Every structure is written in structure tokens, then in C-alpha cells.
Amino acid sequence: MRKILLVLLTFLSIDARTQSKDEQAIRQLLNNQSAAWNRGDIESFMKGYWENDSLMFIGKSGITYGWNKTLDNYKRGYPDTSAMGQLTFTLLNLKKLSAEYFHIAGKWHLQRSIGNLEGYFTLLFRKINGQWMIIADHSS
């Protein structure tokens, strides 16, 4: 019985370490995104998104498919650093769905001289070629 318990505890601790490593990678990606945004660097901000025509972004104007179209929308909506402001994310829930997928819920806030903005988001991450990437974003 002790051997079975030891084996189970070993597997559980391995899974917990893996999940922590995955969560750390996702948190780092989001930190990198906010740092890029706060520098006024939308292109670097977009490195967290899957560079693919199947990327899905849902916002107040509806659904946008594709990395390039999403980048264009960001550039159009935030044409300069005063419009971009300073971005902060508050993560409310991180849930590992499988070894390949993570679901994140959180809040975003833009501190701006022209008026602050804030809202909520859900992100679907997929591990692609060993890297966590945002494949779907619903921000409001």
C-alpha cells in the first residue's frame, strides 16, 4: 500500500511541477506583451499571438480571423502611444484544459492621459512547437 501511495504522490508532484512551468511560461508571455505595449511596440505585443490565419479575435466590432488582420485592427485602434497608454493585466483564472491547451480569464486596464479604458478577456492558449501561443482572444 505504501508503494502505491508513493507512486501516486510522485505522479501528482510531477504533474504539479509541469503545470507550474506552463503557468509560468504563460504569465511570462503576458508580462512580455504588456511590456511591449507599454513601449508602444504593437508588433512585439503581437508575438504572443499565433501567427496564423486561423487566429480568432473577438472584440466590440465582432470576430476577426488572422494574425495580420488582428495586428491591423490594433494599429488602427491604437495609432500612437497616447492612445495605447500603459497596459496592466490582472489574471483571474488560469485553467489547464490538457497538455496542449490553457484557458485564461482576466481583466485589462489602460491608464491613459486621454481617458482610461478597462475590460475583461478570455484567452485560449495552445502549445505549438513547444511554445504557448494565444489562438483565441475575446476582449471586451
Where are the regions a protein language model picked out?
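Short, low-complexity N-terminal intrinsically disordered segments enriched in polar/charged residues
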Residues: 9, 14-48
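A short hydrophobic beta-strand element
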Residues: 99-108
